C-alpha cells in the first residue's frame, strides 16, 4: 500500500463521517481490527464492536474536519483533525495501521 492509498483512506474515512455512513467505515476495517479511542480506554475488538462505537459517535452528531496534512510511515498514516459535536470541539490525531490487504488493522486516537 503506497502513501497515496493511505491518504485516500483518510479522505474516505472523513467523507464517510460526513455522510454518517457506518457501512463505508465498516468496509475499511479488517475483520479482527482494534480501535482504541482515545488511547488508554477500553479497546473495541472486531467489526461488530467497532461499528457499534462508530454508530454512537455518529448518533451524537460528530463531524470530522481535517486540520493538517496526513503523514505516512511504514504501514501507517497519522492525521490531525477536529471532531465537532454540538457544544464541543476536540483536537485529535488518529493513527491507522494497515494489514497486507489494505484494511485498517488498528486505529488509535490521541486526544
Region spans (language model):
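Short, low-complexity N-terminal intrinsically disordered segments enriched in polar/charged residues
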Residues: 1-27, 31
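A short gly/proline-enriched turn/hairpin at secondary-structure junctions
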Residues: 34-43
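Short beta-edge strand/loop motif at the mouth of beta-sheet-based domains
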Residues: 42-52
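Generic alpha-helical hydrophobic packing signal
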Residues: 9-16, 43, 78-81
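A beta-strand edge to alpha-helix "cap/lid" segment located at domain peripheries
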Residues: 2-5, 36, 51-111
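Short hydrophobic/aromatic-rich motifs at helix boundaries and adjacent loops
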Residues: 21-27, 38, 64-67
Amino acid at each position: 500500500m503506497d502513501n497515496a492509498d493511505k491518504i485516500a483512506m483518510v479522505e474516505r474515512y472523513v467523507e464517510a463521517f460526513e455522510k454518517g455512513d457506518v457501512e463505508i467505515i465498516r468496509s475499511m476495517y479488517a475483520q479482527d481490527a482494534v480501535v482504541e479511542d482515545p488511547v488508554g480506554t477500553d479497546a473495541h475488538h472486531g467489526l461488530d464492536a467497532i461499528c457499534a462505537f462508530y454508530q454512537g459517535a455518529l448518533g451524537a452528531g460528530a463531524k470530522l474536519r481535517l486540520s493538517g496534512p496526513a503523514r505516512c510511515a511504514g504501514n501507517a498514516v497519522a492525521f490531525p483533525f477536529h471532531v465537532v459535536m454540538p457544544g464541543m470541539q476536540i483536537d485529535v490525531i488518529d493513527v491507522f495501521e494497515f494489514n497486507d490487504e489494505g484494511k485498517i488493522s488498528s486505529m488509535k486516537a490521541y486526544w
